[in-house]
Amino acid sequence: DRLRSRGLGDVYKRQAEELNVPIIIQTSLGTAEYIGFEPLIAAVKALAEKSSVNVALHMDHCKSIEALKKAIDLGYSSVMYDGSALPIEENIKNTQEVVAYAHAHGVSVEGEIGSIGGAEEGVVVEKDAAMYTKPEDALHYVNETHVDALAVSIGTTHGQFKSKAKINYELLKELKAKLGPVGLVLHGGTGVSDEDMKRCVREGMKKINVGTELNKNYIEVVSKTFTADDVTPLTSLRNLLGPANERIKEIVIDKASLFKL
């Protein structure tokens, strides 16, 4: 999930508590820079301190090693270094630097091998450049970097919401068998059907990213609410944003139920 405002962060936290599940609040580098690292982290820490479930703050798809070190220093509990567009040995070298720094600070690291097509904030991969993760490359990468989690490309696409992904389950099974305890991560979850989502979890996926669906629904509801006939300059923004937050809450509940084994 993504943190667009403190209001949304509180929505995620409250729903996680109701479902009694841990939660990952995930941001892009752009979001952290827009809000400001310090106020963003302080807001999430305040939510976490009052929460009855575990709360992680994760930096998604970051290509800057220095930015990740800053995130680690200021309080992120998990980061993702994305060197998937680089030659594999350069990706490994850079990931090793991030892992060494992160683990020394008690922070977990997600890496990526194989390019997931599509576009989202900070990530654009042309369809022709996207490729499935090669199991032998994934094993080499994991053995050399010691990442805690690995984003793999098995048929999903960033930003996909008009059609459903075709998951390569044979590849998923092979990756799980080769990589053992390393947590497999599925990006592009919006394009995955409910049945495929549940099967991916059964087959070993430990983290599934869903961003586009949240963004799309939030924008649709906000657009409708802000243009309603009864809106005036005196209308409270809290009241205008409330329906969108409720819609996000519904999606969070739905996805959390799919992710449970």
Report residues per predicted region.
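Conserved anion-binding
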Residues: 83-159
